[in-house]
């Protein structure tokens, strides 16, 4: 009897130390989106890296469909914008939909009967491209329905049964418009017109957000480049939506390979002209934090009439064009001003399956607990030390010396904190690009501890068989922990076990940081596109949120400064002739403290 009781007691202890605390129904998400991401072919030593960009989402018959550049060679379908399933085109339309097993920046739109797809083919010898459509995209059944002129970065917009195309890419192409017959797809004679002229000289740019193509990369401060920007922007990725009888035409600038990649919006009462660039631009900007970039976007409505933006975010580790997909809420206020909510846009956001206020679901309170925390690992490659998995930077990473099961990474959170969710951003280190597709999955276990010695398993993904490069785990109930540990079970494509960052979200049981004092702004009088902000250091802050906008009630721009020691920032993205208003907020592991707005 004594032996039986001992066995029962031991089994109870083991079960209490090996709970799987993953939420059964995920209600939050965290950028970048946790997709499997296709293996884009790049001219690098590794030859391949995960990537996707230039996204389009359409809602069709109650389901969402996601199309992205240089990804899986197909598309994805979802019921809730969280869980996605891969779908592939039927073989009959491969020649129409794909170039070398992928497609680039397609035009996708839906009406009540069909989803339409037009590829941006890279074959410059082609004068026309096919239009394909599907009444059953969930099962990958498509057919050809017409042809249109070859376009760079096309956008198809359907309005009251009429079909319009917008296109243009690069410093030598304007944003151009034309209409097609909705049945034959023949171009309507005389409908073609230029909506926005291209830029030939960077000095003619009225707004500084046009600066920095292949000059700025992941810097958040433009001091080293003031007066030196020379490259013309690469405007691209037109997108059009209609709200309250107004048309909103977006395009991306200055170029996709940087954190400053953003969207600009123009408004008009007409679908085919009269578009005016808005003083609150850029309409979509995400600079600072773990990952940046918010350009070449698609704005769409969900099932509950909420607006969203799906967008391109920049990584650039194995190739300049290595990118990810982000999702942000969008709003239109009573004045018709469009706003993309990107503040702390790589922190957890709620995704309620109902009508919501974007201010309530973004940056809603689960704060980062892992920034610059002490760490250790089972092994580390030279140059890829463990601290690079806690630095809040998608462009650095830790790598173990092998991909063997049992390699691990441990983070000391410095104190006991509440943990609500964890984002595990896996890196690709020394992969074998020719490894079988069946090897492309992540498997791991996650543990917590209060002393760094006695571990309790909270997540068991040892039997996982799919790729989860930006795994986001929402816990069913919050846990308290002082340490967190991830242990490798399997790494994709024979690579080494590696992490871009292990990010822990919850509450740090600290006081919120203090208020920023003595904020001052010096607008450059010789070049109003620049302004220098300075403020006093705030102890207890993990960083600062530099907010600004053209009206004190519309501070829609934000640059995240991830270091409490940094107390100045040179902005370069302002517009000549526009007066700005500024505020600097502080944040830490327990919340955000709003600053005081000052005006020029």
Region roles according to the model:
Residues 571-592:
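Beta-strand-rich modules
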Residues 391-459, 469-515:
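Aromatic, loop-rich ligand-recognition surfaces of beta-strand-rich domains
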Residues 264, 442, 471-472, 565-570:
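Short S/T/G- and acidic-enriched coil/turn segments that sit immediately N-terminal to beta-strands
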Residues 462-466, 559-566:
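Short beta-strand segments within Ig-like beta-sandwich modules, predominantly Fibronectin type-III
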Residues 20-230, 242-289, 304, 312-357, ...:
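Beta-rich carbohydrate-recognition and catalytic domains
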């Amino acid at each position: 009897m004594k032996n039986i009781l001992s066995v029962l007691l031991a089994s109870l202890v083991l079960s209490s130390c090996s709970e799987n605390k993953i939420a059964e129904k995920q209600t939050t998400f965290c950028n970048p989106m946790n997709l499997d991401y296709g293996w884009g072919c790049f001219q690098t030593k590794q030859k391949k890296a995960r990537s996707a960009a230039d996204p389009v989402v359409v809602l069709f018959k109650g389901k969402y469909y996601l199309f992205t550049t240089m990804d899986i060679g197909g598309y994805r379908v979802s019921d809730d914008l969280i869980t996605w399933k891969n779908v592939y085109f039927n073989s009959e339309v491969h020649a129409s939909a794909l170039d070398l097993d992928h497609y680039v920046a397609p035009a996708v739109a839906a009406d009540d009967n069909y989803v339409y797809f037009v590829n941006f083919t890279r074959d410059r010898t082609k004068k026309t491209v096919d239009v394909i459509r599907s009444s059953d995209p969930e099962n990958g059944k498509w057919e050809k329905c017409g042809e249109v002129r070859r376009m760079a970065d096309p956008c198809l917009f359907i309005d009251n049964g009429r079909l319009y195309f917008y296109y243009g890419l690069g410093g030598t192409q304007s944003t151009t418009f034309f209409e097609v017959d909705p049945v034959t797809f023949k171009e309507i004679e005389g409908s073609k017109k230029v909506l926005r002229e291209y830029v030939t000289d960077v000095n003619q740019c009225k707004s500084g957000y046009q600066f920095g193509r292949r000059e700025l990369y992941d810097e958040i401060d433009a001091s080293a480049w003031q007066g030196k920007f020379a490259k013309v922007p690469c405007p691209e990725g037109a997108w059009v939506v209609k709200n309250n009888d107004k048309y909103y035409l977006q395009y991306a600038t200055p170029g996709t390979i940087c954190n400053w990649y953003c969207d600009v919006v123009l408004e008009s009462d007409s679908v085919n002209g009269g578009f005016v660039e808005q003083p609150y631009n850029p309409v979509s900007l995400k600079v600072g934090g773990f990952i940046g970039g918010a350009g070449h976007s698609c704005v769409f409505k969900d099932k509950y009439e909420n607006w969203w933006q799906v967008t391109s975010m920049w990584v650039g580790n194995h190739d300049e064009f290595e990118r990810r997909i982000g999702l942000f809420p969008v709003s239109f206020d009573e004045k018709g001003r469009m706003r993309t909510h990107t503040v702390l846009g790589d922190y957890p956001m709620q995704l309620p399956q109902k009508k919501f206020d974007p201010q309530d679901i973004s940056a809603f309170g689960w704060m980062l607990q892992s920034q610059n925390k002490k760490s250790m690992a089972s092994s580390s490659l030279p140059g890829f030390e463990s601290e690079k998995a806690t630095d809040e930077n998608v462009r650095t990473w830790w790598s173990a010396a092998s991909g063997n099961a049992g390699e691990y990474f441990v983070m000391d959170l410095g104190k006991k904190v509440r943990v609500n969710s964890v984002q595990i951003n896996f890196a690709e280190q020394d992969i074998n690009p020719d490894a079988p597709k069946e090897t492309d999955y992540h498997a791991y276990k996650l543990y917590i501890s209060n002393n760094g010695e006695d571990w309790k398993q909270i997540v068991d993904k040892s039997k996982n068989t799919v790729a989860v490069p930006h795994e986001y785990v929402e816990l069913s109930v919050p846990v308290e922990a002082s340490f967190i540990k991830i242990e490798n079970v399997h790494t994709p494509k024979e690579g080494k076990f590696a992490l871009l960052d292990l990010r822990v979200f919850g509450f740090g049981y600290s006081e919120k940081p203090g208020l920023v004092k003595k904020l001052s702004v010096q607008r450059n009088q010789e070049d109003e596109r620049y302004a220098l902000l300075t403020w006093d250091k705030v102890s207890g802050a993990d960083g600062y949120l530099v907010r600004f906008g053209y009206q004190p009630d519309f501070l829609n721009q934000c640059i995240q400064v991830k270091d409490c020691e940094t107390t100045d920032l040179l902005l370069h993205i302002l517009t000549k002739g526009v007066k700005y208003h500024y505020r600097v907020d502080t944040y830490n592991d327990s919340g955000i403290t709003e600053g005081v707005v000052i005006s020029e």
